A protein has these predicted regions:
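Classical Sec-dependent N-terminal signal peptides that target proteins to the secretory pathway
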Residues: 1-16
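An acidic, Gly/Ser/Thr/Pro-rich helix-cap/linker signature
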Residues: 18-100
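Export/targeting segments at the very N-terminus of extracytoplasmic proteins
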Residues: 26-37, 81-115, 126-152
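Short, functionally critical alpha-helical segments immediately adjacent to catalytic or ligand/cofactor-binding
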Residues: 32, 43-53, 104-121, 153-158
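Secretory-pathway/luminal and periplasmic proteins that interact with or process carbohydrate-rich
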Residues: 51-58, 118-127, 139-143, 160-165, ...
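Substrate-binding/active-site groove segments that recognize
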Residues: 123, 128-137, 150, 174-191
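Acidic, glycine-anchored loop motifs typical of Ca2+
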Residues: 192-196
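Conserved small/polar residues in nucleotide/adenosyl-binding loops
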Residues: 197-202
Length: 202
């Protein structure tokens, strides 16, 4: 009986969240249109958006909240990753050197960030970015921040700067080799080829 009761409570909570999320989506559409997002773009990009309970869980239990610096770094660095970074540099030497010279940023820093964030582009995340951002916008903890990120992303989609069909990444809404948030993408990203190509990693 206890298990049945717990299941009923959890199921009821999820259903309530999903219903509230649907209502939020209706209201957010009004807000998006006020922010000059076209109805066509909104309907196209947001048609398959769903509430993702696990995103809320990830948000509440981020490793940065409970791991000390030594533990955090040791879990994300290894001699194997260093070797992989060296090979990645050898395969993309001209591109990385060009970026270093053109934007005055050390190639070692580029490689280190890429290694930490996505293991040199081999794992960029599998979460639906639009659903993740929508879930976090719906959630009250940092709603304003994520609502703004979602609006920025919709504007990038509207301008054909990003293909919404390629938007998969982290639970927090970051994507690409360096895991940029939409605002970072808007302000700093340089378009080379395509979001999924190595030459567009930075």
């Amino acid at each position: 009986y206890f298990i049945i009761i717990i299941f009923t409570i959890i199921n009821g909570t999820l259903n309530a969240n999903e219903n509230d999320f649907k209502e939020w989506l209706i209201n957010f559409k009004v807000y998006a249109l006020e922010k000059k997002i076209s109805e066509k773009t909104f309907n196209l990009a947001m048609s398959d958006v769903v509430f993702l309970p696990k995103v809320i869980k990830y948000d509440r239990f981020q490793p940065e909240f409970y791991e000390d610096t030594k533990t955090y770094i040791s879990k994300r660095t290894s001699s194997k990753k260093v070797s992989k970074g060296i090979n990645f540099y050898k395969e993309n030497t001209n591109l990385i050197n060009t970026i270093e010279n053109q934007y005055n940023i050390d190639r070692e820093l580029l490689l280190a960030l890429m290694g930490i964030e996505t293991n040199f582009g081999t794992y960029v995340g599998k979460m639906d970015i639009l659903s993740s951002l929508s879930t976090l916008s719906f959630d009250e903890r940092r709603s304003e921040f994520f609502s703004n990120e979602l609006i920025i992303l919709l504007k990038l989609i509207e301008k054909n700067q990003i293909d919404y069909k390629l938007l998969y990444g982290s639970w927090a809404g970051a994507f690409g080799y360096f895991q940029f948030m939409p605002s970072t993408m808007k302000n700093y990203a340089i378009d080379y080829d395509c979001l999924l190509y190595t030459s567009d990693a930075a």
